[in-house]
A protein has these predicted regions:
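A short alpha-helical cap/connector motif
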Residues: 1-117, 124-144, 148-192
Length: 192
């Protein structure tokens, strides 16, 4: 097996990657994480999905690719420039709601349906508001976090945040947890 070759990238992926280079976006997403998210989402027909941290939309393209016609996805970022780009790429997809708002504020005020999958790629939902996020996940739903392995661009002392998050999740009794030393370092939890 050669997992270095990722087949079946979303049709729009290369255009988003090109836009990423054009604007100098320095936090591109990993193909492996995208492929995994697509696979997990494909297992949840008629799903309700939340992405915290839209970025430029690279992983969003994978997530949308895995959705069926009756699934819904909300993606949130607080950067209006990135949200505008995501809107250009995905704004016509009736299944997708693209929200420009602080993730903490959004999580604290959200009153809608629970989620089948939450992908946390931003501070809110990953290092803050964790209890709220886990409350919003259906039984059998996934909580996915990436960037858990040390990276060159991490600020000093960031490893402490990662260690605290993992320790906290390991101590919870309402989730099954798998830590994966793969790609950017992943944590996948399933709500009991």
């Amino acid at each position: 097996m050669n997992d270095l070759v990722v087949a079946y990238k979303p049709a729009i992926y290369n255009l988003i990657e090109e836009k990423s280079r054009e604007i100098g976006f320095t936090m591109p997403s990993d193909l492996y994480v995208g492929s995994l998210l697509k696979t997990l989402i494909s297992s949840k027909p008629k799903s309700n999905i939340l992405e915290l941290g839209t970025g430029i939309g690279l992983l969003l393209s994978w997530m949308i690719d895995g959705m069926d016609s009756e699934s819904k996805l909300i993606t949130i970022d607080n950067d209006p420039t990135l949200i505008s780009i995501a809107q250009d790429f995905f704004g016509n997809d009736h299944r997708v709601s693209i929200v420009c708002e602080d993730g903490t504020k959004w999580l604290r005020t959200y009153k809608g349906n629970k989620f089948d999958l939450v992908f946390a790629d931003a501070w809110p939902g990953k290092y803050s508001e964790i209890d709220k996020v886990l409350e919003l996940i259906k039984i059998g739903g996934f909580y996915v976090v990436d960037d858990m392995s040390a990276q060159e661009n991490w600020p000093d002392e960031h490893q402490k945040n990662v260690d605290q998050l993992i320790g906290y999740l390991e101590g919870r009794e309402d989730i099954f947890l798998t830590k994966m030393n793969w790609s950017t370092g992943l944590v996948i939890a399933v709500k009991k």
